[in-house]
């Protein structure tokens, strides 16, 4: 009986040790990552941001992934028409995750030379497949903290992660938002970072959905990236909040 008791006790202690070790692991979504410097395209784009920042004169800074970068593609005309008076700069890179953006504004020094009045941040969709909602929210919080440390006077308009689908559908059909439950979890968590002072949360993802809660191809041709019409929805949704925050 004593042997059995000792064996059970050892197993329990081992299990507790494993659990504690797991809790001690750093959050990968909140750990700055510079491995994308090995990708020529990514490195060149990052370097272009550093060069742009060195010139200064940026009031509104957009930070994010390919959806943000798309302002230079499908959203180019909308950007030119909607943001012409904002002195805006687009620092979005396709494929970026929270940890990449975190490195860019810390080790990558992309903020050196600018003191934006406002940063518009939308990031996290590329983490959905490999991180928990809690980890992703932790990555977003790390970005907010790093940004505030570097630029304490910069206001932040934090956007909820946009809806998306992970399932291909027939041409011209609307797609069910398969990943929406997890995205809702993420958005529920990051919405709590709104402090009414320097961080302001805005979620307008529902504007991309039809009356069935599906993603129309006309707004998201691949059910992830926006069309020109999708970028118009984005521009319209942030126009008043941005104008208000620029006056703070």
What are these regions (language model features)?
Residues 1-63, 67-82, 149, 244-248:
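N-terminal secretory targeting modules
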Residues 59-64, 87-92, 117-123, 127, ...:
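Structural recognition of the beta-strand scaffold that forms the well-ordered cores
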Residues 48, 62, 96, 100, ...:
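Extracytoplasmic/secreted proteins, especially bacterial periplasmic and envelope-associated proteins
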Residues 68, 95, 206:
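Short, glycine/acidic-enriched loop or turn micro-motifs at the edges of active sites
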Residues 106, 124, 141, 145-152, ...:
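Sec-exported extracytoplasmic/periplasmic mature domains
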Residues 88-93, 126-133, 176-177, 220-228:
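Second-shell loop/turn segments in exported
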Residues 69-84, 98-141, 146, 153, ...:
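Oxyanion-hole/transition-state-stabilizing segment in secreted/luminal serine hydrolases
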Residues 163-248:
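Catalytic His-Asp segment of secreted/periplasmic serine-dependent ester chemistry enzymes
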């Amino acid at each position: 009986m004593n042997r059995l008791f000792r064996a059970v006790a050892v197993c329990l202690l081992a299990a507790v040790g494993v659990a504690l070790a797991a809790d001690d692991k750093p959050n990968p979504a909140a750990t700055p990552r510079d491995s994308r410097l090995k990708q020529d395209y990514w490195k060149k784009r990052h370097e272009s941001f550093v060069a742009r920042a060195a010139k200064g004169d940026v009031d509104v800074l957009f930070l994010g992934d390919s959806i943000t970068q798309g302002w230079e593609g499908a959203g180019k005309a909308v950007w030119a028409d909607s943001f012409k008076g904002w002195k805006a700069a687009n620092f979005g890179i396709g494929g970026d995750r929270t940890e990449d953006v975190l490195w860019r504004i810390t080790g990558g020094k992309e903020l050196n030379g600018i003191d934006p009045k406002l940063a518009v941040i939308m990031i996290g969709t590329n983490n959905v497949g490999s991180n928990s909602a809690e980890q992703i929210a932790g990555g977003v919080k790390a970005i907010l903290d790093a940004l505030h440390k570097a630029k304490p006077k910069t206001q932040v308009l934090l956007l909820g992660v946009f809806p998306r689908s992970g399932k291909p559908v027939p041409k011209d059909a609307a797609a069910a938002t398969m990943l929406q439950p997890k995205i809702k979890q993420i958005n529920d968590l990051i919405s709590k970072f709104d402090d009414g002072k320097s961080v302001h949360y805005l979620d307008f993802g529902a504007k991309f959905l039809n009356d069935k809660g599906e993603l129309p191809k006309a707004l998201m041709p691949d059910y992830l990236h926006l069309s020109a019409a999708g970028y118009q929805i984005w521009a319209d949704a942030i126009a008043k909040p941005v104008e208000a925050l620029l006056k703070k």
